[in-house]
Each structure stands twice: as structure tokens, then as C-alpha cells.
Curated annotation (Swiss-Prot):
Modification Phosphoserine occurs at: 101
Entry GO terms, CC: cytosol
The protein's required cofactors: Mg(2+)
Biological process annotations from GO: carbohydrate metabolic process; peptidoglycan biosynthetic process; UDP-N-acetylglucosamine biosynthetic process
CDD domains per UniProt: GlmM
Source organism of this protein record: Pseudomonas putida (strain ATCC 47054 / DSM 6125 / CFBP 8728 / NCIMB 11950 / KT2440)
Pfam families with a match to the protein in the record: PGM_PMM_I, PGM_PMM_II, PGM_PMM_III, PGM_PMM_IV
Entry annotation: catalytic residues: 101
Binding site for Mg(2+): 101, 240, 242, 244
Role of this protein: Catalyzes the conversion of glucosamine-6-phosphate to glucosamine-1-phosphate.
Family stated for the protein in its record: Belongs to the phosphohexose mutase family.
Protein name (database record): Phosphoglucosamine mutase
PROSITE patterns reported in the protein's UniProt record: PGM_PMM (PS00710)
Length: 446
């Protein structure tokens, strides 16, 4: 059964456009409360990033959950992985995150976590969708949910992050620049690194509700590159708006993406006898990651794009490390979801143990040229991925790459985009193929 509202990472869209409206969020809170209450007493944590619309949707969800008889614990602005962690430690039935991750402020969305701090199973999301189609009812007044606020949430999460590295760890002498994207990490991330001894310069940590991800963070890394170079820092760390993605910049200003961070973490775990199994990437992971891991005899498998699918593959195989090149990195020995701060700490720990700079560590992975072009499609009824001309062109490019590259066409799970990716050994050839395919996809979408 297909899902009506839930995409690969919850529900997301433009604020004020259905379903990202206060009335829908009220009903969603009620439906979620009813679904979680089927197991008896229900307690739900609610957190958000720094978007101005988060306050509006927080109130709507709170009312809906209470109407269903669910108790609500408000966290305020907190990173998405912090909400997963706190949901677990408070033994709540579920956690709800109000965020649109790396999107601009005029988007927002909802993510759910189970009581174990993992993304909800598909069957629970389908149950919530079925309840959304039913009339909303209110429990009798004596059974209405109560609302409280967790005032020490940030401190709890900071201590948890620090516990992911050995207690004797000190990053004294390490000069960092940290870009918080005016988002949910703006308070906790600087504290974590400073309390571990690093010299931290903070960028973009003055959220006003409208500036989240605006020209900053992991999707706009230019200002971090400049700050690292000007300040002669050892490296820079860029988070996205909700703190589940991380990219880095080495001391030369070069960007270090999720594939490279994943390799550094996996190699460190292997060298210390702590790598359980192999590594999970996605269909978008660079071929160079697969080859570099193969050189170390580390198994590598590809999941569908989306950290929920990476996590599912890790759990099924009982492996520890996986992620996406966009910067979602999951370390199952510490977390139940992608956690940007935890991932950054594991990279810093790996560098410290090897006595390497970030620039040196990334040299062990030789990335293949990869060109990704996003093609926006509107109300066209044509499925570009099923169009005969697109299929034929894709097959021809695959044949031309002669087993030394890949072609991937897929729809985004969160935006009206077709992602055209071509990967191979010759960058000019790869770019030409990607541009030709993207042009064709755009034409059939009209």
C-alpha cells in the first residue's frame, strides 16, 4: 500500500500549503496520538529546529496529541538526533521532530521516531494515515494529555555526545570552525567541542526564525571554507539546519563529503578491532568509496537513498556504520539515527589516533568523477523515469561507460525533483552524459 503523506523522511512541504498547515498538524497530532495510544499510556516528545513556523506547528501538534489522550513533553529547538536519543532515554512511546532539515525557512515538515529512537516502520506510518481519514474525536476531559517542558534537554544531549569518545579524550590544541546553519545545533554543538578542549570559532549561530540554512551550513559551505583559510584553522565542520548532516572542510579549504567521512570512521573502527561487519552506503555513494573499502577488505552494500533505508540495512545485517554522501552518517555503536555531532566527533577521534590531518586522511579514498543534476518537474502526468526515450538514453550511456561507471535516475523523496547522476573515470565524458540525460528528462516533463 502506497503512502499518501509520508515521503522518505517524513512529511515535508511549503508552509501554508497543504499538508503543511496548522489544521493538518492538529489532525496529525491527534492521529499519531491515537496510533501510539493503542499500546496503553502514551507519552510523546516534541522538538523542532529554529524555523519561525515551528512554534505554530508545535502548538497544533500539542493540541492534537492532548486531544487523543497523549502526554506531551516539549524540548524546544534541538537537533533531530537529540530528539531520537531523548525519546529513548525518557522511555517515551514516540518522538516528533518539526523540521525541514536542509531546506529554506519557508518549508517545514514532520519526522517521527519510535520509542527506540528509530524512524517509524512503514506500517505505523500507514496506520497514522488511515486515522487521518477518520473524524477527529476528543477523549473525555479526565483523560486529556498533559503537557510539560524538559528544561535540561540540551545538557543531557551534550553529555551524551561527549560520551561517544573515550572519557580521557582531549582536543586541546585543535582549532575548529563550526557552522551551525542558524539551526538546531546552534547551542549544543559549540558546547560539545569546547568542553572537549577544542578552540572553536562559531559561524551562523544567531537564528531569527528566517535565516536557517540561508547561505550557510552544509548546503552552502563557501563561508566555512573562507573562515578556515582566514583563521588558519585545522578544519571546519558544517551542519545542516536540524543537525543530522555534516560535511567538513580541511585546512586547505577542500570539502570533505559524507563518503569520505564514512571511510575515515570505518577505517578507524577496523584498525581498533571494533568494525562489526561492513559499511552501508546508498545508490548515490561514490564508486571510489566502494573501491577504497574493498582495498581494506571491508564489505560494502548499497541501500536505497534515505537514512531510514541505510539504518534498516544496518539493523538487518547487524553492522555498525553507514551513511550518505550528503553527510548523513549513522554510527550504530552510539546512535539510532544519523547524528552530525556524533559523526564529527568520531572523525576527530580517528584523526587524533592516527596523528593525521583531515587532508591526509581523505587521500586514501580516490573519488571517481560524479555529476549530479537535479531536474525539477511540475504537474506533468508523464513519469520521466518510465519514458521510453529516457530509458533508451540511459541504457546507451551505461553501455558507453563500459562497466567503469554508473548511471542513476531517481525521484527525490522530499521535493519534486528527478536526480540525474552519472559516474565514471573521465570527468568531461561524465558531465556530457549527465547534461544530455538531464536535458532529455526536462523535455519529457514539460
Amino acid at each position: 500500500m502506497s503512502r499518501k503523506y509520508f515521503g522518505t523522511d517524513g512529511i515535508r512541504g511549503r508552509v501554508g500549503e497543504y499538508p503543511i498547515t496548522p489544521d493538518f498538524m492538529l489532525k496529525l497530532g491527534w492521529a499519531a496520538g491515537m496510533a501510539f495510544r493503542k499500546q496503553g499510556h502514551c507519552r510523546v516528545l516534541v522538538g523542532k529546529d529554529t524555523r519561525i513556523s515551528g512554534y505554530m506547528f508545535e502548538s497544533a501538534l500539542e493540541a492534537g496529541l492532548s486531544a487523543a489522550g497523549a502526554d506531551v513533553m516539549l524540548l524546544g529547538p534541538m537537533p533531530t538526533p537529540a530528539i531520537a536519543y531523548l525519546t529513548r532515554t525518557f522511555h517515551a512511546e514516540a518522538g516528533i521532530v518539526i523540521s525541514a532539515s536542509h531546506n529554506p525557512h519557508d518549508d517545514n515538515g514532520i519526522k517521527f521516531f519510535s520509542g527506540q529512537g528509530t524512524k517509524l516502520p512503514d506500517e505505523v506510518e500507514l496506520m497514522i494515515e488511515e486515522l487521518l481519514d477518520q473524524p477527529m474525536t476528543v477523549v473525555e476531559s479526565g483523560k486529556l494529555g498533559k503537557v510539560s517542558r524538559i528544561n535540561d534537554a540540551a545538557g543531557r544531549y551534550i553529555e551524551f555526545c561527549k560520551s561517544s569518545v573515550p572519557s580521557s579524550t582531549s582536543f586541546e590544541g585543535l582549532k575548529l570552525v563550526v557552522d551551525c546553519a542558524h539551526g538546531a545545533t546552534y547551542k549544543v554543538a559549540p558546547s560539545v567541542f569546547r568542553e572537549l578542549g577544542a578552540d572553536v570559532t562559531v559561524l551562523h549561530a544567531q537564528p531569527d526564525g528566517l535565516n536557517i540554512n540561508e547561505g550557510c551550513g552544509s548546503t552552502h559551505i563557501e563561508s566555512l571554507q573562507a573562515a578556515v583559510l582566514v583563521g588558519h584553522a585545522d578544519l571546519g565542520i558544517a551542519f545542516d539546519g536540524d543537525g543530522d548532516r555534516v560535511l567538513m572542510v580541511d585546512h586547505t579549504g577542500a570539502i570533505v563529503d559524507g563518503d569520505e567521512l564514512l571511510f575515515i570512521i570505518a577505517r578507524d573502527l577496523q584498525e581498533h578491532g571494533k568494525l562489526q561487519g561492513g559499511v552501508v552506503g546508498t545508490l548515490m555513494s561514490n564508486l571510489g568509496l566502494e573501491l577504497a573499502l574493498k582495498d581494506l577488505d571491508i564489505p560494502f552494500v548499497r541501500a536505497k537513498v534515505g537514512d531510514r533505508y541505510v539504518m534498516a540495512e544496518l539493523l538487518e545485517r547487524e553492522w555498525l556504520v553507514g551513511g550518505e554522501n550528503s553527510g548523513h552518517v549513522v554510527c550504530c555503536n552510539h546512535t539510532t539515527t544519523g547524528d552530525a555531532i556524533i559523526a564529527a566527533l568520531q572523525v576527530l577521534m580517528a584523526l587524533k589516533r592516527r596523528g593525521e590531518t583531515l587532508a591526509q586522511a581523505r587521500q586514501a579514498l580516490r573519488k571517481c568523477p560524479q555529476v549530479l543534476i537535479n531536474v525539477r518537474f511540475g504537474a506533468s502526468k508523464v513519469d520521466p523515469l518510465e519514458h521510453p526515450a529516457v530509458k533508451e538514453a540511459s541504457a546507451k550511456v551505461t553501455e558507453a561507460l563500459a562497466g567503469r561507471g554508473r548511471v542513476l535516475l531517481r525521484k527525490s523523496g522530499t521535493e519534486p525533483l528527478v536526480r540525474v547522476m552519472v559516474e565514471g573515470e573521465d570527468e568531461s565524458q561524465v558531465r556530457a552524459h549527465a547534461e544530455a540525460l538531464a536535458k532529455l528528462v526536462g523535455e519529457v516533463c514539460v
